């Protein structure tokens, strides 16, 4: 190639051999030197790629070897939880790579090979066709290194494809390869341009290089479409199979956006996420966040131990966001240079066109670089915090399974899982801002000083003051957050009690008092958070101080240091302001983050303290480790000993000086059936806890040994909200259907299961079932697991006698399955029928001593030995359950999804909660703040325009600066008042109203609905949703409003300063509208799924904690944890995808800003070049104002997006509250209109509110009652009594009549399952009636019907002649006294309620009378031990057993109703198996207590014991929802049917009447 002789050395080829970087203009205009391009564009990226590729290859090969070893070790094991995993668990399956990916890989390898060939050809042409004088010293080495780098590409791509982690998905193109190819294309293009200029565009070398560039683009495209080939054949994450560009611009999310836009997303329809986020992988990486040997005390490093452990668990991935963050910092800090160059270009007159084109190109590179680096930075940061979330939640669940059950632990776990983990993850997402902010500050200050000199250092002073303030606030914020979260825990604990006891609360009519107690706790919570919220106000005020005060201090110092007449050029002033704004804008965020870090450290400290808690020690393991035999050392072993306890004393607390069980010695051989009995509160359940290892012996030299697999059934059955069939086989690995059939038949569940819908759930803790059905399910589940040792804690007490006798014979009889399998059984019971079949009977007395015992013989024993109990009326018709449930595959959420709740309704609900005046003040405060914040920019524009010509200035600099300083102080005053109003007034006001809305919805919901909803789902609304309302929503609302109003002001300023930009505003508005329209549909659904999936975690944690003893007894922890991990995977997917779509939106908005910047720059350059002739030109001050706002507009829009998307999430919580409140069926206050009632017997009194004294006498009358749990149409047929009335009315004139009239009707109702069918019954005032029947016969339903808790479709129920259908339900339940089956004491733990106030809130009785009641009920000693009547009523303080709780509730009822009844008043008392947990002697005494304290009260009692039933005036037996028998025990002639029902004969009554021996006595 020929060239002209150079005129100087700078214009010869020697100029190309210098580093430059710019080449002399006489050679080429606006270009780099060849040497610079070879070093920077070829050598550096190629060498870096080769080093990184070698490191990656070593990592892949080492990982492949580790996986091969791990696979060999794990293929022999079976995942016991696979049947319970769902949703995104599918991504765990190792789907083989299909033909599409194989063909794609071949194409990629062929393209890469051809590319290497072209590079080798180019190297040959460079050496052969280009003279050495036209090459630099690095031309050939650079080409060799480049060829080597491209030779590594197919090698690395091949190993990424073949040696991938099996669960990680197909990666046909490595991210590293994609990054290198994209960088190589961008950098290689200028080099090809240089070669074309040097060697001619038609040379062979240039042609090969152009072909190489094209082939690189093809290879990039091949890599980008790898995800399309993968999606067709696999179920792997589209993110992992996406290429570099797909990851950079978020194209892998397009499938999610399209699906969300067109259809409704569900947890199962979400795309699989990155396999590195799978819980099993995260748990392995984060396993050391749990202390190896927890000491029960905080760790040595305190809050930093867990923080360091988290980052250590992330490993090098913790540093992944560093590179994109540095790139983002570089692009951001380049903006002032661009602005300064643009202002100089505009202000310095004509300039070459290439300078303008260079500015446009620089604008494109800078703002596009900001967009892409922002996307990468936040995607990598969110991936890390998603891992941290998974690790922390998984760690909390693991730790919970290792702890002993203690009061408050469950609420603490739920609070940590939601509140603390959220605070930690949302804060740690900004972790890298902590180290990059000082770097940006240092560079920005240095550059500021270059413009204004030493006065620029003043900005460091204000930054230091603000940082010190934020650090101080952060330290105290952690303390105040602890105080606040402690109050949250108390409220959550009380709410959990309320939800768990919702049936008892509704029956007792305690809803209003419970709601008031929860509201009181809510108020205490806001009082506890007041200082925390005040600190937030201080934080926000401090964060805005730098942005507003720094310009004033810098310019003031500059003016004072120079002369009073000093003036600024537009370039100096606006460049300085841009640097200050770039310093202040991230500092606003940083100064808000620092206190948040303090709060996050406080949360880490709370979780770490939880991790350090002393763990449950399984004494069985320790004993078995010492000696595999449970026999005494030195003792000749004749029989195999299953369990033994030697010289051991036990108590519920380790520090108790007086053990409950003392010097226990017990040896039980394999196959023995041992019964333990004793009075209430003597320690029977504690003995079982000791055998389980849940409590440790308190004396030295003790020994507890258990040999074999254990199963445990507690007195309160632990059941999960599954179908009944799933419960039975829940933890069974035995797939033998014949064994399952035997267990189902032995537990008398066959007919019950056949009557159930296969998909119907049983409700939280089996709330849709009767007590007997719950216990039988738990018993079947335990036996199904084939235990060696079975521990039963009074599980048969809620079961009717006949069913119980069958179960006893089929389980414990000589042909029973437990006898056949040689299962050792230890059973706590008060039931003599159970004791009959025991090999050993032991009794615990009040002193804690365990002694052999023999029940006295009774006539019942003789009958049971001589006759079969399976005769009589119980076989005359099939048994039916009164608790059949509708098909329910999960908890019944509101019928409409939250997405159906419009935004208008959500905002209206929130604005209604804060009040109209507060709303107006908030909007006004925001507008004032935005105006005050941005108006100084306009003032600066006027200032520079006026000062451009000092001779014509209208005002001196003091005028301009003084007003400028005042204007910059106004935003601080405005923001202080604005935020104070929000945090101190709006937050408690809205939080209280929304909490009350939830409480009212739950308390007023129909019983049939609320009993089917998962407790975890409900609790999630009181926990997570209200946490969003209290802590997230106010800050999100403030940040959204501030960013929105500020952004509007910036756009206005840009448009006013650069008028030509106004033409792009409509286009910008249209783009933003379409963007939000497309984005919001998906993001809203993901937010809902995020909240929904956390409800599942709530449920799993809550259910697991309630069943800890049962789970640990059978060692089901691993399976429970695996299932929790499956639920955590389902929860991680929407969380991660929501963060990713938010990152995508940030990327797109930054690209929009890039487009706006290009419009500004292009118009400015165009007007400068061509506008002089037409008179249209851009002013320097106008461009300065435009760029001053443009440099921060992108960050403003990003902040707006971040705050707005977070606000949408919190508003999603309000949408859930609105949806739940709207779609939850509420009880009607009055079932029918009073004027439509049939007043038979009631006269006209039904039309008015019952008098205060109602019911005065307590008479009850049921006439042809048909009742159902179906509440879809409560009022249906309530006003139509035809067909439901008895044939003849029972007179109400006081004459003696048969108390019960049994009628039949011809009407048949087959469309609805009726729990009560044509019940007619009359109970006279003061009469005591026992209601008996088989399990599920409708006994409890009868009481629920009386209380209006189930729908009475036909018939009539009246009390004292008044139809209860016309009585408000709250009034009805308040007038009837109830003791439910599951005793409920109080939710008010922690708010100061005393035992005295709980027993007699109205103060009707004196302390002596209250003490007498407690003494008669047998719980006075417990109350005295807890601190007397002035002690707290909390469960932790009382420590009552199940039986003692029933006695306490009885005492409370007597205290509240006894005054009236003892002075001649009547009333009604309903007992729903209220003494089922008491021994027979105590049960008998309760009847005497009731007669003593409530002599005139009408009693309707559901019970199972014949001995107790015979103490009542009459006995009613129900079967299949109908009245089967009614007898009066005192009659001389009684039908034998009633005794046949109880498995007794007539002789039993005769022995009772003649003083025969009875074990009751």
From Swiss-Prot:
Keyword DNA damage: no
Primary residence: membrane
Entry superkingdom: Eukaryota
Residue ranges occupied by any ABC transmembrane type-1 domain in the UniProt entry: 326-599, 920-1209
Cell location: Membrane
All copies of domain ABC transporter, residue ranges: 645-871, 1297-1545
CDD domains assigned to the protein according to its UniProt record, in alphabetical order: ABC_6TM_ABCC_D1, ABC_6TM_ABCC_D2
One Pfam family matching this protein: ABC_tran
Key words, A-Z: ATP-binding, Glycoprotein, Membrane, Nucleotide-binding, Repeat, Transmembrane, Transmembrane helix, Transport, Virulence
GO molecular function per UniProt: ABC-type transporter activity; ATP binding; ATP hydrolysis activity
Entry function: ABC-type transporter; part of the gene cluster that mediates the biosynthesis of the phomopsins, a group of hexapeptide mycotoxins which infects lupins and causes lupinosis disease in livestock.
Sites where the protein binds ATP: 678-685, 1333-1340
Compositional bias of kind Basic and acidic residues: 1229-1238
Family: Belongs to the ABC transporter superfamily. ABCC family. Conjugate transporter (TC 3.A.1.208) subfamily.
Region annotation (Disordered) ranges: 853-899, 1229-1298
Segments crossing the lipid bilayer: 34-54, 110-130, 139-159, 172-192, 202-222, 314-334, 358-378, 428-448, 452-472, 535-555, 577-597, 913-933, 969-989, 1037-1054, 1147-1167
Species for this entry: Diaporthe leptostromiformis
Bilayer topology: Multi-pass membrane protein
Glycosylation sites: 384, 647, 721, 1189, 1496
GO cellular component entries: membrane
Biased segments, Acidic residues type: 1269-1280
Classification via Gene3D superfamilies: ABC transporter type 1, transmembrane domain, P-loop containing nucleotide triphosphate hydrolases
Protein name (record): ABC-type transporter phomO'
UniProt-listed InterPro entries: AAA+_ATPase, ABC1_TM_dom, ABC1_TM_sf, ABC_transporter-like_ATP-bd, ABC_transporter-like_CS, ABC_transporter_C-like, ABCC_6TM_D1, ABCC_6TM_D2
